[in-house]
């Protein structure tokens, strides 16, 4: 199907695509999907999309993803997201990330998270981050993390904080460590 034909598929009909059909889509076809079509895709069908094609989704398409779709993405799909795509994620979708998905975020993706997205991470998500992911956060990001989440940092995670990050901690965050 051409990009125009893909874009012309009724939103209600997108649900009828099989996982195999989604997996076989070209990058051009994926980019032609409307935001309504993306939002209407079954979570398991989106999971079948290749990581390369996930990286080709526009930021508006990323914003259209549902929490169920995000929670069902593979760790390879999560790692394929560009930093612009990560920044575009709705905070509810950041909260929907599984611990495996959160742990799969690259250091570049971690550095791309907005303050609101970091605040949306759950204590469990924060507590399972790798030390390298913590070290990748900017000072501004560190200061945006909720005090309860700072308290959940492991000794290894806390030791990964750089001097600039430690300097950015608030008094309540320091007390929580």
Residue ranges and their predicted role:
Residues 1-177:
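General marker for long, soluble alpha-helical cores
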């Amino acid at each position: 199907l051409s990009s125009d034909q893909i874009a012309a598929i009724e939103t209600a009909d997108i649900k009828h695509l099989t996982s195999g059909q989604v997996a076989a889509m070209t990058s051009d076809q994926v980019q032609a999907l409307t935001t309504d079509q993306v939002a209407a895709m079954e979570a398991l069908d989106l999971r079948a999309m290749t990581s390369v094609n996930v990286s080709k989704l526009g930021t508006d398409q990323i914003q259209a993803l549902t929490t169920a779709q995000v929670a069902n993405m593979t760790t390879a799909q999560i790692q394929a997201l560009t930093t612009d795509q990560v920044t575009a994620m709705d905070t509810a979708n950041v909260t929907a990330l599984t611990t495996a998905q959160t742990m799969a975020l690259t250091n570049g993706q971690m550095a791309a998270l907005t303050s609101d997205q970091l605040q949306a991470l759950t204590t469990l998500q924060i507590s399972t981050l790798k030390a390298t992911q913590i070290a990748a956060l900017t000072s501004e990001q560190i200061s945006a993390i909720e005090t309860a989440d700072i308290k959940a940092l492991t000794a290894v995670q806390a030791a990964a904080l750089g001097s600039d990050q430690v300097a950015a901690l608030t008094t309540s965050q320091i007390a929580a460590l």
